[in-house]
Amino acid sequence: MRKSSCKMGTNSNTLVKLKNAGYQQNDKWLVKGVSLEVEKGKIVTLIGPNGSGKSTTAKIALGIYKKFDGEVEKYTNKIGYVPQKVSIDWTLPLRVRDFMVLTESLKEEAIDEALSLTGVVHLKHKNLGNLSGGEFQRVLLARAISKKPELLVLDEPVQGVDFTGEIALYELIKKISEELNCGILLISHDLHTVMSATDHVVCLNGHVCCSGSPSDVAKIMSIKLVG
C-alpha cells in the first residue's frame, strides 16, 4: 500500500473528495475503490451491512489513517466527528456541560448554542448516566457542532434509539446541515429511514455497489432483490 497525501486547497463548495480510496489491514482489503465528494450544505450517506467498509471509509476521509490507497483531497480543517463508539465511565458524575468541554475549551455561549440547536439545552446540568439513548446522541451531535464545523462526519448517529427517535434525529441532522451550511458524511444501516434526510447515497460492501440519489439507489437495490 502506498502512502497517499491529503491535499489542502480552496474550492467554493467541495469539502472532501475521495478518489479510488481504499484501506487494507493484515493484507486484507477492508474497503477499496471508493470515490465520493461531500459539498457544503449536502448530506452524503454511506450504507451497507456490518463489515462493509463504511466506518473505514469515514476514517479515510477524516485522515485518521495515514497510509491508504487512492487520494483524499480536503478543503477544510473545520471538522466535527461523532464516532460509532464513545468510551465513557457511566458511573462517573459527569454532567452534560462537563462532557462538552472534556477535550477542548468552549465558551458558555457556544455550549448553549450547540445544545439549543440539538434540542437539549435543558439537560445542560444533568448527569450523562441519566440520559436516554436519544438524548445522549443529541449531546454528541451538540459537541460535534460546537465549533461550527464545515464538515461533519457522523458514524451511526442514531444507534440505541427507537424508530420514532431515529426519524427525529435524521430530521435534526438535516436541520443542522441547513443552518450551519455544513457538509455531512453520514453512516447509516437503513436506506429507507434516512432517505428523506440525504442528498446522495453510496452503497458499500467492501467496494461501491452503487451510488446516486436515494430514490435511484432504492430502485437499484429493489431490482437486485427481485432479480
Regions found by a protein language model. Give the residues of each.
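Conserved ABC ATPase "signature" region
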Residues: 108-123
